[in-house]
């Protein structure tokens, strides 16, 4: 039996939020979703998620900066950066900002694999 992670989704596209929620809800607890970086920082403090699925391009700000701030303040919270742009430079910058994974939005299986690596007792 695997542990259910508390997941917060940060994406400004409601269809993406709905799809990711459905994908993850079978094995994890989606505790909330937000559409802006400002709301994200507030939600992290209130909801205390284990994992954040963070869109690279939130409309109100710098997702990489938010990732950096979250991982520095909340060392137990992990961030998976989620983007439709698989540019190696962006991937590098995401990992430098503290993301534990960078996942292409087009491949849901990659997101599931990233979560499997986060659950204690699972190895890939």
Where are these regions (language model features)?
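Alpha4 helix (beta4-alpha4-beta5 surface) of REC/receiver domains from two-component response regulators
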Residues: 65, 86-103, 109, 113
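Short amphipathic alpha-helix used as the core "switch/output" element in two-component signaling
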Residues: 64-75
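Non-catalytic signal-transmission and effector/linker regions of two-component phosphorelay proteins
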Residues: 1-8, 112-124
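Conserved sequence signature across two-component system core domains
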Residues: 10-11, 34, 52
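Two-component/phosphorelay signaling modules centered on CheY-like receiver
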Residues: 14-32
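Active-site beta3 strand of CheY-like receiver
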Residues: 47-53, 58
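Acidic catalytic/metal-coordinating carboxylates
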Residues: 36, 62-65
């Amino acid at each position: 039996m695997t542990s259910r992670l508390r997941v917060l989704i940060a994406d400004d596209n409601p269809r993406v939020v709905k799809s990711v929620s459905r994908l993850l809800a079978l094995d994890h607890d989606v505790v909330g979703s937000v559409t802006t970086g400002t709301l994200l920082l507030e939600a992290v403090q209130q909801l205390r998620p284990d994992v954040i699925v963070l869109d690279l391009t939130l409309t109100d700000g710098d997702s990489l900066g938010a990732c950096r701030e979250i991982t520095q303040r909340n060392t137990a919270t992990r961030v998976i950066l989620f983007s439709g742009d698989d540019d190696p430079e962006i991937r590098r910058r995401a990992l430098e900002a503290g993301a534990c994974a960078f996942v292409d939005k087009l491949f849901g299986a990659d997101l599931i694999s990233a979560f499997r690596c986060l659950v204690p007792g699972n190895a890939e």
